[in-house]
Amino acid sequence: MTRAATSEPNSAENPFPVRAVAIRVAGWIDRLGTVWVEGQLAQVSLRPDSKTVFMVLRDPAADMSLTVTCPRDLVLNAPVKLAEGTQVVVCGKPSFYTGRGTFSLRLSEIRAVGVGELLARIERLRRLLDAEGLFDPRLKRPIPFLPNMIGLITGRASAAERDVKTVAAGRWPAVRFAVRNTAVQGPNAVAQIVEALRELDRDPEVDVIVLARGGGSVEDLLPFSDETLCRAIAACRTPVISAVGHEPDNPLCDLVADVRAATPTDAAKKVVPDTAAEQRLIDDLRRRSAQALRNWVSREQRALAQIRSRPVLAEPLRALTARAEEVHRARSAIRHDVTRLTAAETERIGHLRARLATLGPAATLARGYAVVQTVGAGGPHVLRSVGDAPAGTRLRVRVADGAVAALSEGPTDGE
């Protein structure tokens, strides 16, 4: 049998009964006293026949919630109408109900978070995100000129969805959309928008994502200044266009997104080109190109005409004719000089030939001289001494008109 309290330590052999644990937990929580809590109302259950109102207070940044209860009169006399999405600050005492084992906060005071306070918090978050570099223009991704498919996150059957799709189709009839309808205000908006954003970012066919919502109060647009949503937009690989509210509205998602559009209609104009405008541009470019080509041809024709009008091209043989006489005179002079030089050289060669004939052996032989050569095994040799022609030596005697053979009888006396 187990006991609520024992001197022995708690263990599997000595467990606490449920009532003991519940009473201890209730005691710990009861010692907390009253606490101030801020959150967003996610559910308000106000039954006509009940004096107690049950509500759920949610923390959008952490996706956590807390059950709260309060007297009916406290809700009816609240400074603002309490509804889902209302940001409030409450004072209450934590309670643990031992019978059901549930935790709740019993409220004694409810205060609405004023617009000024909301704006101040948004400004503090803006400074934080700016300091982290989430607004850096260098991180902005370019929007494709003609996206294959456009991801559109907006409220179901909303004017923003109708405006974006109608204007985009009017500008580019072949445009395609992947639409994700989500809550765009209230406690569930941030979670649904972030989920849709991540889903479209994973889709390889989606080239750009448009986040669209019409105008509204600061409270209505509060989800679009949520830190979780801003960081989800910054983490996207797909370019994001923020088209939330109207021109004066400036939620933080506008600063994180790659492109800010003043309205959903403006987003449609930014995301796809205008077919008519592009056709006009093409026609204008073709017209300007044709005119530029015609101007170029005209300039080249004028330049060619100027070149052809020059004397050297108008009468190309004129220069040759002017130089023909000069060439003729030069040719005659060359011929005269060549003839004169040829005659002089011919005469000089004749003189040299005559001198050569006079000094040569043939001229000596013609004057009656003879050349005597010995004939031997080594070939003929000119006889230079009588000692070279002993008796019996064969001789060859060359005269002017030929040669005769002779035989030496040896040296003789006398002349």
UniProtKB/Swiss-Prot annotation:
It comes from the Bacteria. The keyword Hydrolase applies. It is found in: Cytoplasm. It holds the Pfam family tRNA_anti_2. Heterooligomer composed of large and small subunits. One of its GO terms (cellular component) is cytoplasm. It catalyses: Exonucleolytic cleavage in either 5'- to 3'- or 3'- to 5'-direction to yield nucleoside 5'-phosphates. GO terms for molecular function: exodeoxyribonuclease VII activity; nucleic acid binding. PANTHER family: EXODEOXYRIBONUCLEASE 7 LARGE SUBUNIT. It comes from Mycolicibacterium paratuberculosis (strain ATCC BAA-968 / K-10) (Mycobacterium paratuberculosis). Its EC number is 3.1.11.6. GO terms for biological process: DNA catabolic process. This is Exodeoxyribonuclease 7 large subunit. InterPro entries: Exonuc_VII_L (IPR003753), Exonuc_VII_lsu_C (IPR020579), OB-fold_nuc-bd_dom (IPR025824).
